[in-house]
Amino acid sequence: VYFARNIAVAWIFLEATTLCAAGIVYHRRTAQALEAAWKYVFVCSTGIAMAYLGILLLAAATDCESLDYATVAAAAPGGSALYLKTAFLLILCGYSCKAELFPLYTVGVDANFAAPAPASALISTGLVNAGFLALLRVYKLLAATEVFPWVKSVLLLVGVLSLVVGALFLRRTNNYKRFLSYSTVENMGIAAIGLGIGGIGVWAAVFHVVCHTLIKSSLFLQIAVVRQVYGNYRINRIGDYIHINRVGAVGLLTGMVVLVAFPPSPLFLSELMILKQTIA
């Protein structure tokens, strides 16, 4: 996905990640893990099918014999506006299950909860980034078209919805793993807002995703240690963790401070850049 130069090749490898991720979600072989794995396969396959229809419409709109990114980007300005808009909507909705954006974000949250912590770290970073990159490349394809302002507006709306939904569920959950999963939805919403704003917001969005990857993976791995100590992921049960694992508790606290974008953390800097571009 990261190195593909062709839209169809990127789509194939994103579909492959669905099958690979389902296996690690079912690692514990419990009824809950089985349900989450099947849900992940079904919803992601539905999303990927929607993205495939979007790619077909994109090919029809540009009348390209090749789906190489460079070829499609060169032909996109002459494409039908209706086809391009419909194609982008389908691709955005389809890949939202991978990028953990509204509307198909729920499947990633459930998969993270059922999977072992290292697998959750992979899903919330590597797979989410793959979905984000696929959307970013389509975003770049349409940059020279007449529908690009509309594309940015849609991304801005999706970003705001993802941010709001993630923030609302963050307040309601008492489970550390779900807390981190909804935090991913919130942070990917911020990245989508950066793309929707454009300009320096695009670079801020990429920087935000990279920093989120480093922080979130470390937090999921530390949560695995917490579960070994307490046997669960309940937030209100780990108040004395600093007396049991001082180094781990400091690392967990530091990661949470960075995750909530407390200045001068890198996530604060990326959000500040997006805010400055918004009011510019």
Predicted regions and their residues:
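Hydrophobic transmembrane alpha-helices and their helix-loop junctions in integral membrane proteins
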Residues: 1-8, 20-280
